[in-house]
Amino acid sequence: YISPATREAVYAIYYDELRRKIEDRGTTNFPEAAGRKLYGELTMIITVNHTGGVLDTEIVQTSGNNLLDRRAQAIVRSLAFGQFNDGMRRQADQIVVVSRFRFTREDGLQTQLSSQP
């Protein structure tokens, strides 16, 4: 288990790519219901395996809108994040990322990765 607080460059690059992929997909496929965009904030724990596949997503702080929470999970599950490089693989089989999602009118989806929910 390696948290985003890890300062090694190899992990920093991977976490930045993970964050950008989530934001790009979430902004492109912004959650909607009945033709109206859904806005809010939530916190999700994401578990990624060494092949870059998403093993699990768990909402630890809801947006208050179950549909938005489910759509955020679907965005993450639809992605592949790339295989761990050799340095990462020697240290971990999977990583657990705590991510704060902000779906906003102005900026689309913004995420912030941390090691604490």
Region annotations inferred by a language model:
Residues 14, 18, 68-72:
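Stable alpha-helical elements in mature extracytoplasmic
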Residues 37-42:
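Short, small/polar residue-rich loop motifs at catalytic or cofactor-binding pockets
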Residues 12-15, 31:
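Alpha-helical promoter-recognition and RNA polymerase-docking modules of transcription initiation factors
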Residues 1-5, 20-27, 49-61, 73-84, ...:
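Conserved "boundary/linchpin" sites in short secondary-structure elements
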Residues 30-35, 87:
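Surface-exposed patches in mature extracellular/periplasmic domains of secreted proteins
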Residues 61-67:
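A short acidic/small-residue loop/turn micro-motif
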Residues 5, 9-13:
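Intrinsic disorder
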